[in-house]
Curated annotation (Swiss-Prot):
Keywords: Calcium-activated potassium channel impairing toxin, Disulfide bond, Ion channel impairing toxin, Neurotoxin, Potassium channel impairing toxin, Secreted, Toxin, Voltage-gated potassium channel impairing toxin. Disulfide bonds join C7-C29, C13-C34, C17-C36. It comes from Centruroides bonito. The record marks Y37 as: Aromatic residue of the functional dyad. It is found in: Secreted. Gene3D superfamilies: Knottin, scorpion toxin-like. This is Potassium channel toxin alpha-KTx 2.23. The keyword Lipid biosynthesis does not apply. InterPro entries: Scorpion_toxin-like_sf (IPR036574), Scorpion_toxinS_K_inh (IPR001947).
């Protein structure tokens, strides 16, 4: 799921993705936006 958080590295997506899907969520930074994966 893409979320409305800008990023330059996946580390910036860590907290928003964990807030969304919990502590085992996965994250990537794609095209300047965070993408979160369900655990």
């Amino acid at each position: 799921t893409f979320i409305n958080v800008k990023c330059t590295s996946p580390k910036q997506c860590l907290k928003p993705c964990k807030d969304l899907y919990g502590p085992h969520a996965g994250e990537k930074c794609m095209n300047g936006k965070c993408k979160c994966y369900k655990p």
